[in-house]
Amino acid sequence: MAVTGGGRPAARQQAARGKQMQRTFNNVKITLICGFITLLVLRGTVGINLLTYGVGGGGGSDAVAAAEEARVVEDIERILREIRSDTDDDDDDEEEEPLGVDASTTTTTNSTTTTATAARRRSSNHTYTLGPKVTRWNAKRRQWLSRNPGFPSRDARGKPRILLVTGSQPAPCDDAAGDHYLLKATKNKIDYCRIHGIEIVHSMAHLDRELAGYWAKLPLLRRLMLSHPEVEWVWWMDSDALFTDMAFELPLARYDTSNLVIHGYPELLFAKRSWIALNTGSFLLRNCQWSLELLDAWAPMGPKGRVRDEAGKVLTASLTGRPAFEADDQSALIHILLTQKERWMDKVYVEDKYFLHGFWAGLVDKYEEMMERHHPGLGDERWPFVTHFVGCKPCGGYGDYPRERCLGGMERAFNFADNQVLRLYGFRHRSLASARVRRVANRTDNPLVNKEAALKMDAKIES
């Protein structure tokens, strides 16, 4: 990923150089001590001890010499143990240090850099953090924007600048079909962003080895917020979610007083404490201090291993209907909003007026009916804004639904959305199950007039 963040890589390099110098110094000490031991051995074998204890060398002198040698050897062994201990600590630091710069705290004093990650994680009282605490971000961001007018927080249309963020695993999928449909999902997101003037980042890097799986989005979102102060909203979207209403635009004015916009059902959230009351497959975070603090509060349940397993037990006991498994980011967010309602909910907008997240199983077989009765731009059950293939896992073989049904549904969703894009060029898919296209209009005889008609994205599409 092309996005980088500030001076942290330089700090990491400086820390690495410091560790290298320390290891070099330790090696020199070991070499000198080994040389000293060699000198002692030679003294005992070729008679160098005569220079120290005299030629006569009575029994008393031999006893003193033996005691002195024993003391020296003991000191040498003690020093060697300390050196080995120091070296082991350095190696642990390197092994424990996460991939992302956000997951460690680096302090620089008089050109000496110390990475404290491993020591903190070895502490039984350690609470996981995404990185150094950021304060006064709103003021710092305003100041940066005023000093960098070339990076405005609004786009050419005067709307708040949005960064759409998605991602996929670094390794290939289990089979080529998974990679193919992830590519289609990425192409779908690029199309929507191009039409609506939204920037997009697709990450294939794990920025923090502790936060893998569901949790990988948290360090990525934090890093992008801090690296792109010109962005007003950061919009996360899962790789298995597709835009299916290419004309619908986010009603951003509705969220003027909100910092988190997430699809969900308030009744399920507050009355039933359901673990599916919200969906973190598609949500928006405002680039502000509040959001950074929410990410900090959200992350501690995420580190893989014992922490995540124990947190999963807490979430299963706290939320209705949740199966027993390790902590996931969606359940953790719901738990935080319920247990710390006064702290967070005033700035959370639970969106249920349109499908910021639409469950695929009840949608993909109705696309023809939607085209017959409705038109793009509605965003709700009549023409869903987003179709999310929850439980399909196209990149792996352990989904909750038959693989053929999932891939067939993704094909239909992609072509349903792609027809809305191809209309501009006078083409459409032969059917929602086919990748082949056919010409439906000649857009080249009077291109500018035809373009004006085609740009009416919310016009009815002929079935």
Swiss-Prot record:
Question: Which EC numbers does the record give?
Answer: 2.4.-.-
Ranges per topology, Lumenal:
48-463
Which region ranges are annotated with the description Disordered?
Answer: 1-20, 82-125
Please tell me which top-level EC class this enzyme sits in: transferase
What functional role does this protein have? Probable glycosyltransferase that may be involved in the biosynthesis of xyloglucan.
Q: Which family does it belong to?
A: Belongs to the glycosyltransferase 34 family.
Name it. Answer: Probable glycosyltransferase 3
Source species of the chain: Oryza sativa subsp. indica (Rice)
